[in-house]
């Protein structure tokens, strides 16, 4: 796995901390998933106080604060600075939403905010689209990680555009890439790892499942399977059949 700003992730799964039925289920799901990174919202921390923060710390995972809910560059930058003070980390998942219904990122504002935050000493994890040019601009702005969406946030649709995600992996072979948003099933997570992505970030698929803890276990196993499959160098798909049984020595009857 590629390093994220010099840090090796203990696990390719990044898991969000919102929407769980209870703090106890959140904790159980995290432990079942083996997730190495927890994404947290400054708004959640402000509302729940030290109890929530203490529980997350006790999980022993890396913390990735986010700027969820921000719609302007100024708002995102301000939220990032506040998060750094609260959580004590230069990591920031930069979310800058441009469309209310689809929650599609505002890529123009995203690039500007990424540049400002990088200059301010942040290590930026930008939630972006699968557009190659946007990816190039984000790297030029100082980002060392890209987080393209699989599908709109919370949609559970999986990987809407595998072609674009494969192209991004090929275009940025040395850059850590994370599929962020849209994962709904373990098979979606496995597929992202099969494509060579370094990690997946998900929240709703686990938190809103009928049994979040069981879904967390399923995600952990799927991610492991996808990672192993990618390492194994799988065969390429073909349009025509290819016999797996040799015909040498086969008897011919007249």
Curated annotation (Swiss-Prot):
Enzyme Commission numbers on file: 2.8.1.10
Pathway in which the depicted protein is active: Cofactor biosynthesis; thiamine diphosphate biosynthesis
Cellular compartments annotated: Cytoplasm
Catalysis performed (reactions): [ThiS sulfur-carrier protein]-C-terminal-Gly-aminoethanethioate + 2-iminoacetate + 1-deoxy-D-xylulose 5-phosphate = [ThiS sulfur-carrier protein]-C-terminal Gly-Gly + 2-[(2R,5Z)-2-carboxy-4-methylthiazol-5(2H)-ylidene]ethyl phosphate + 2 H2O + H(+)
Entry annotation: catalytic residues: 93 (schiff-base intermediate with dxp)
MF terms (GO), sorted A to Z: thiazole synthase activity
Family annotation (Pfam families): ThiG
InterPro entries according to UniProt: Aldolase_TIM (IPR013785), Thiazole_synthase_ThiG (IPR033983), ThiG (IPR008867)
SUPFAM superfamilies tied to this protein: ThiG-like
Biological process annotations from GO: thiamine diphosphate biosynthetic process
Keywords recorded for this protein, A-Z: Cytoplasm, Schiff base, Thiamine biosynthesis, Transferase
Chain sites annotated for binding 1-deoxy-D-xylulose 5-phosphate: 154, 181-182, 203-204
GO CC annotations, alphabetized: cytoplasm
Signal peptide as annotated in the record: none
Function: Catalyzes the rearrangement of 1-deoxy-D-xylulose 5-phosphate (DXP) to produce the thiazole phosphate moiety of thiamine. Sulfur is provided by the thiocarboxylate moiety of the carrier protein ThiS. In vitro, sulfur can be provided by H(2)S.
Protein family: Belongs to the ThiG family.
Subunit structure: Homotetramer. Forms heterodimers with either ThiH or ThiS.
Protein name per Swiss-Prot or TrEMBL: Thiazole synthase
Organism expressing this protein natively: Ruegeria pomeroyi (strain ATCC 700808 / DSM 15171 / DSS-3) (Silicibacter pomeroyi)
């Amino acid at each position: 796995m590629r390093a994220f700003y010099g840090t090796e992730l203990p696990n390719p799964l990044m898991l969000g901390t919102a929407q769980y039925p209870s703090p106890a289920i959140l904790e159980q799901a995290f432990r079942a998933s083996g997730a190495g990174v927890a994404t947290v919202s400054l708004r959640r921390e402000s509302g729940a106080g030290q109890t929530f923060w203490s529980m997350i710390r006790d999980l022993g995972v890396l913390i990735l604060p986010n700027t969820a809910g921000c719609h302007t560059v100024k708002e995102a930058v301000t939220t990032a600075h506040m998060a750094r003070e609260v959580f004590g980390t230069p990591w920031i998942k930069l979310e800058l939403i441009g469309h209310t219904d689809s929650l599609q990122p505002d890529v123009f504002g995203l690039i500007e905010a990424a540049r400002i935050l990088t200059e301010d000493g942040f290590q930026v994890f930008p939630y972006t689209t699968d557009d190659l040019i946007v990816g190039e601009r984000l790297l030029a702005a100082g980002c060392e990680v890209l987080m393209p969406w699989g599908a709109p946030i919370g949609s559970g649709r999986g990987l809407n555009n595998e072609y674009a995600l494969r192209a991004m992996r090929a275009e940025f072979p040395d850059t850590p890439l994370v599929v962020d948003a849209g994962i709904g099933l373990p098979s979606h997570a496995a597929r992202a790892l099969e494509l060579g992505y370094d990690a997946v970030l998900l929240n709703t698929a686990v938190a809103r499942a009928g049994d979040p803890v069981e879904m967390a276990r399923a995600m952990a196993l799927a991610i492991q399977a996808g990672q192993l499959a990618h390492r194994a160098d799988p065969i390429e798909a073909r349009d025509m059949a290819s016999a797996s049984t040799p015909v040498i020595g086969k008897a011919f009857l007249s």
